[in-house]
Amino acid sequence: MRWTASRKCECPHLIRHGFAVPPSPHRGRQRGAQTFADVQESDWFYDAVCYVTDNGLMNGTGSGFAPQQTTSRAMLWAVLSRVDGQNANDWYAAAQLWAIQHDISDGTVPEAPITREQLAAMLYRYAQRKGLVRAASYADLSGFADAASVSAYADEAMQWAVANGILTGMGGKLCP
């Protein structure tokens, strides 16, 4: 993440991989992290919170942004549908339907915590749908101690996510 001269938060890594965000009524207002008591400018995730809130991708919770909260499948559906320009203001019902209709997810267990391999699979399907996956963008996962524990459905997506720096290992493991 970085700030532009006009103090707009940018996320060049995700933009490079095609996850550019359509115009939002909130873009450029810098309402972001400054309005959340649980997000401080010194936090490592501050720029990310600014980006997702300034671009209307996330709104936080009733009591703050909740950066330590576990991400659910529904949360990712909502974010991806908003990146795709959908109006998903009803929390997740419309986003769930969008994810099913676009083969991003099967739409099951919305409140379940999302695993790293589920995250990779959904991002990969979205990137494929947008024509953003290049043939040379896959990594060899054999260097990770738990590579064999990656589910078959997510193997190619995990290779793509690692090759493109979307996911990295933790202590020599993928933790799928």
Predicted regions and their residues:
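C-terminal beta-strand-rich structural cap/linker in extracellular carbohydrate-active enzymes
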Residues: R7-P23
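Feature responds to low-complexity, polar/acidic, surface-exposed segments characteristic
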Residues: P22-Y46, D54-Q118, L123-A154, L167-P176
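Non-catalytic cell-wall polysaccharide-engagement segments
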Residues: M158
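Histidine- and acidic-residue-rich, metal-dependent catalytic cores
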Residues: A161
